[in-house]
Regions:
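Positively charged n-region of N-terminal signal peptides that target proteins for export
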Residues: 1-4
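Hydrophobic membrane-insertion alpha-helices, especially the h-region
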Residues: 9-21
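Structural signature of transmembrane alpha-helix termini at the membrane-water interface
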Residues: 19-26, 142, 149
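Short, flexible coil/linker elements and helix-boundary hinge sites characteristic
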Residues: 23, 100, 118-120, 170, ...
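Ser/Thr/Pro/Gly-rich low-complexity linker/stalk segments immediately outside membranes or between
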Residues: 25-44
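C-terminal amphipathic alpha-helix
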Residues: 38-93, 130-194
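Mature extracytoplasmic domains of secretory-pathway proteins
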Residues: 96-137
């Protein structure tokens, strides 16, 4: 009788250990899957932000010189430069409006990157810091593309300074960005070519 009770208790203990072990394994697998999904989301956000940096840089380098040229030409022709700038702004409106949409997306991508830094600072901290600097520069460039301000001279000085900052931060980002993010950027570029 005692042997039956001992074997019964051992059987129950073995079953309980097996159930607990299975539960722990399932939790570990679930946690690993969630971590992998978060990592994929972080890489995607970093890649999209990088791609959007390039788009915003293109818009700024395309739009700002056109404002300057229209402004300068209006002054040379003794016309109201406000009218000339407004007309140029109107002709570039769809591009400038699209840059506002891109800029809004970048805010969310930067927020996702801040989550990535909290979870994996060794991988994302340097890139996130450079992204924040770039975001500040892009904010100023966006403001100038939406509403050029100052005199022609100060506008040109400001635009040139901002474009130089953009190039500097872009170079820093190119060094800091990891290969998996670069690969994802290439996928985004291919997808957007279609």
């Amino acid at each position: 009788m005692n042997k039956k009770i001992i074997w019964g208790i051992l059987g129950i203990v073995v079953i309980m250990i097996a159930l607990v072990s299975m539960n722990v394994l399932q939790e570990n697998a679930k946690e690993a899957k969630e971590k992998k999904e978060r990592e994929a989301r972080y890489v995607q956000a970093a890649a999209e932000f990088y791609y959007n940096i390039e788009l915003m840089g293109f818009v700024a380098t395309f739009v700002l010189p056109q404002y300057s040229e229209a402004w300068s030409k209006a002054i040379d022709d003794r016309r109201d430069f406000n009218v000339a700038i407004h007309a140029k702004r109107k002709s570039l409106n769809s591009m400038v409006a699209q840059s506002s949409v891109i800029y809004s997306d970048m805010e969310g991508q930067l927020k996702t990157m801040s989550e990535a830094v909290k979870e994996n600072p060794n991988k994302y901290k340097e890139l996130y810091d450079e992204y924040k600097k770039m975001y500040g520069t892009i904010t100023s460039l966006k403001e100038q593309t939406e509403s050029p301000s100052g005199t022609l001279v100060t506008f040109n000085q400001n635009a040139n300074m901002l474009l130089q900052e953009y190039k500097k931060y872009k170079g820093n980002i190119d060094v800091a960005v990891s290969q998996d993010i670069k690969n994802e950027v290439e996928k985004i570029k291919e997808k957007n070519k279609k």
